Amino acid sequence: MKKGISVILAVLLAVSCLTGLSGCGSSKKTTLYVYNWGQYISEGDDGSLDVIAAFEEAYPNIRVQYSTYDSNEIMYSKLSNGGITVDVIIPSDYMIGRMVQEGMLEELNFSNIPNYQYIDDSFKNTSYDPENKYSVPYTWGTVGIIYNTKYVDPADVTGWELLWNEKYAGKILMFDNSRDAFGIAEYLLGYDVNTTDEAELQACSAKLAEQKPVVQQYVMDQIFDAMENEEAWIAPYYAGDYLTMVEENPDLAFYRPTAQGYNMFIDAMCIPTCCQEKEAAEAFINFLCSPEISSANMEFLGYSVPSTAAKELMDPEVAGSEVAYPDADTLTTGTSFNFLPEETSRYMESLFMEVRNG
């Protein structure tokens, strides 16, 4: 894919000049505020495509102001508190459902997003956006356990209980967000990962408190340095990010606890109601849906692409990765997080903070 970057840009520049927002014949200057997960877009490292630079080249009168967050909850809190301008966000499925219900997302004008045609039908009509009004899938993936084969006995890698194993005390990392952390406890205890039962949530909290003595630290993006540099040996995290880490440390392996269950997610591009530049935001979303851009972006990130047209352009080794694209039988053992009632979300968050900070 790297050798085709100049061709990609030439094609996209030609196409963009046919659109009203390309800037090819316009003098209006626009700043587009994009708020995304950390390490979640190809930035031109190691000869990869710099997606933001490519967009700004295709749309010379749009300047992207790019900032990042570590969790859905941080993003939600920042937007719900108000007082900021954000034009594009990329929340996860359950958070999209919450934001739709609370009136925090704009309906999209799909006439400005013709590349939506390349999104596979299996990623449309979802539970969180059943009428396809508010979101365009960006990536999908699964959660599993990353472990270092130099230090972890494979006989111990049998399920989520590995994250509680005292043999590896001080070398275990844990998610620093309530939904993912509670999800693991729910899988381990055999509960529905979308439970609203307070007794079950309390049991999960107790299980996480039981784990705390063996946890080195609660992390999100900090996991990269910790696992790559062998400061930690075991951590739950996203399959796409594992594929980035293993390039830096080939002793890392990935395990999905299929017998107990694991989270399968979709992250999608949305426009919040605080947006000031909706057409530019839709142009950005459309740009990222281009098979050429999407394939180059996801090939670098390691995340799974929700577009067969894009996948067909990727390096066959990447597109054939079982970690990124598990088989149908494996996928049947994964479950998705649904939007929880506000009182449940707040209760879960308070329980998690008690564990984390207690």
Residues covered by each model-derived region:
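Short, low-complexity disordered leader/linker segments with a strong preference
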Residues: 1-32, 358
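Early extracytoplasmic/lumenal segment of secretory-pathway proteins
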Residues: 28-98, 225
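A structural signal for short loop-to-beta-strand junctions that line the ligand-binding cleft
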Residues: 84-88, 106-145, 171-173
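Mature extracytoplasmic/periplasmic domains
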Residues: 267, 272-332
